[in-house]
Amino acid sequence: MLVIEDVRAYEVLDSRGNPTVKAEVTLSDGSVGAAIVPSGASTGSKEALELRDNDERFGGKGVLKAVANVNETIADEILGLDAFNQTQLDDTLRELDGTNNYSNLGANATLGVSMATARAAAAALGMPLYRYLGGANASILPVPMCNIINGGAHANNNVDFQEFMIMPFGFTSFKEALRSVCEIYAILKKELANSGHSTALGDEGGFAPNLANNTEPIDLLMTCIKKAGYENRVKIALDVASTEFFKDGKYHMEGKAFSSEDLIERYVELCAKYPICSIEDGLAENDFEGWIKLTEKLGNKIQLVGDDLFVTNEDILREGIIKKMANAVLIKPNQIGTITQTMRTVRLAQRNNYKCVMSHRSGESEDAFIADFAVALNTGQIKTGALARGERTAKYNRLLEIELESDEYLGEKL
């Protein structure tokens, strides 16, 4: 049996220049695993707590408290644990914290240790991470949801919807699907420049121009898909992140106030006009009646993804399944705090025929853990930004590596 012999953490920077936690775990045979924890901008209120220092350093965004929790409290408790028993490790972290949302230790402390331990164990066995976590059945390359126009909390522009994405379904390999996205992205840059729009990038590598409304970005994407020659092979996905503009029972966008019913009708109209296959967070995280109506209206036609609605939480997802809210769940490990809890949520979703989308955060790093994790859990879909910025392309490049060993691309079978 290999045991955890050493644990350490320290501050590094994420893609927004904010501190985050890097954890390193060393096993008794000398194997080492490391992981960098991401950070979100648009966050659900029920997410696990990301512990920040709230002092004068980095405008209060330092993570020395979380680092100290790893180096002192967590290390003392987990040294000597079986490195191959991920469930035992993660349950120990949860019990050590003693809260439902990691408000004592910080989910950025616990997740870093959880991820790093999995990496160390995989290294000790000479296995790729996806194979270690997923076993023999880990084989499916996910369809990417590529966010190539950014709005909302991810960009400094006047677009309300947060992400305008393209999904390359009509391909037999991941590399060919990714090629189509690259070509569409390049055409989009030219289209924006030629029309006098900014080609500045948002947090996730997509372009962030000021546009007339929330429909113009979709029209732009359709133009670029057609010019690239990929009509009927690439579809549109939206992350509305509507909690961000929900106030006093209304959705405030484009200078108007919409009721839940109004917004649902807007989505129905958009889906009738455009090849939209997925809408994420179409309604606010606490607008449960609205979610039920939205699911009744569109749930048998398109994918309705709950992000802020479910926050990768098994118990919250279970309630949503019972109430028939949404039909898919976004999977963000740092929303819940450990690898094991993330896997439990995915399994619950899959048992109940809810689709899963593995996801990055807007504050990312070069760590490509979620690429392996998506394949390990056969989520079939992944959100990891545009084809720009190294912290985004790191995940795509890792998936291209995995494809050399496992070449089943879900594509149209999704």
From Swiss-Prot:
GO biological process: glycolytic process
EC top class, as a word: lyase
Protein's organism: Campylobacter jejuni subsp. jejuni serotype O:23/36 (strain 81-176)
Reactions it catalyzes: (2R)-2-phosphoglycerate = phosphoenolpyruvate + H2O
InterPro entries (alphabetical): Enolase, Enolase-like_C_sf, Enolase-like_N, Enolase_C, Enolase_CS, Enolase_N
Cellular component, GO annotation: cell surface; extracellular region; phosphopyruvate hydratase complex
Residues annotated as binding Mg(2+): 239, 280, 307
Binding residues for (2R)-2-phosphoglycerate: 162, 332, 361-362, 383
Residues at the catalytic site: 204 (proton donor), 332 (proton acceptor)
Gene transcribed to yield this protein: eno
Key word Iron present: no
Cofactors demanded by this protein: Mg(2+)
Keyword tags: Cytoplasm, Glycolysis, Lyase, Magnesium, Metal-binding, Secreted
Similarity annotation: Belongs to the enolase family.
SUPFAM superfamilies linked to this entry: Enolase C-terminal domain-like, Enolase N-terminal domain-like
Name of this chain's protein: Enolase
Function in brief: Catalyzes the reversible conversion of 2-phosphoglycerate (2-PG) into phosphoenolpyruvate (PEP). It is essential for the degradation of carbohydrates via glycolysis.
GO molecular function: magnesium ion binding; phosphopyruvate hydratase activity
EC id: 4.2.1.11
Annotated pathway: Carbohydrate degradation; glycolysis; pyruvate from D-glyceraldehyde 3-phosphate: step 4/5
Pfam name, any one: Enolase_C
NCBIfam families to which the protein is assigned, alphabetical: eno (TIGR01060)
CDD domains documented for this protein: enolase
